[in-house]
Amino acid sequence: MNFKGTTVIAIRRAGKTVVAADGQVTFGYTVLKSNAVKIRKLVNGKILAGFAGSTSDAITLFEKFEEKVKSREDGIIDIKRAAVDLAKDWRSDKILHKLEAMMLVADSDNILLISGTGDVVEPEEDVISIGSGGNYAYSAALAYMENKKLSAADIAFKALKIAARVCIYTNSNIVLEEIG
């Protein structure tokens, strides 16, 4: 099954980090599910991750990413190092190279986008979004970030609601996780 047209957003603000996603699953031109969960807490709830792409591929990548984080002998959680290591493997490994997904990973200090082309991007702003409605959610979130009264969770929720109004592959059944 393929999560075609997913919208996932990550935001950091005031010591809180949020990853949120819509719940729509489409297959071709058909909506198969409206309440899918596309985000996870990893490493005992210290890291949030969300994905756009094939479901089985995303689960594999979540597992590989968590392995990379936990592989440090000193026990330090370094999502930047783990993201780079995963991106290297994803790009060069014959099996992983075929996986079709994008990931957002975040902890209390970082937000990163990881792609199968080997990209690891840390956004300039404390917000990033992926998927078919990603640009809509990102634009809305940037505008909402100017309102200092809104929390990271408020901004993510409002931004995804706007994306759902514009993108036919995004719905307003939002799942949100927060750390910090």
Curated annotation (Swiss-Prot):
Under Enzyme Commission nomenclature, its number is 3.4.25.2
What are the catalytic residues? T6
**Superkingdom of source:** Bacteria
- Which stretch is the leader sequence? none
Instruction: Quote the record's binding site residues for Na(+).
Output: A164, C167, T170
Pfam families, per the entry: Proteasome
Keyword list (alphabetical) reads: Allosteric enzyme, Cytoplasm, Hydrolase, Metal-binding, Protease, Sodium, Threonine protease
Q: Which GO terms describe its biological process?
A: proteolysis involved in protein catabolic process
State where the protein is found.
Cytoplasm
GO molecular function of the protein, one example? threonine-type endopeptidase activity
UniProt GO cellular component terms: HslUV protease complex; proteasome core complex
Q: How is its activity regulated?
A: Allosterically activated by HslU binding.
Q: What is its main location?
A: cytoplasm
InterPro entries, sorted? ATP-dep_Prtase_HsIV_su, Ntn_hydrolases_N, Proteasome_sua/b, Proteasome_suB-type
Question: Assembly and interactions?
Answer: A double ring-shaped homohexamer of HslV is capped on each side by a ring-shaped HslU homohexamer. The assembly of the HslU/HslV complex is dependent on binding of ATP.
NCBIfam families from the xrefs? ATP_dep_HslV, PRK05456.1
The record's family statement is:
Belongs to the peptidase T1B family. HslV subfamily.
- UniProt name for this protein: ATP-dependent protease subunit HslV
Gene, per the UniProt record: hslV
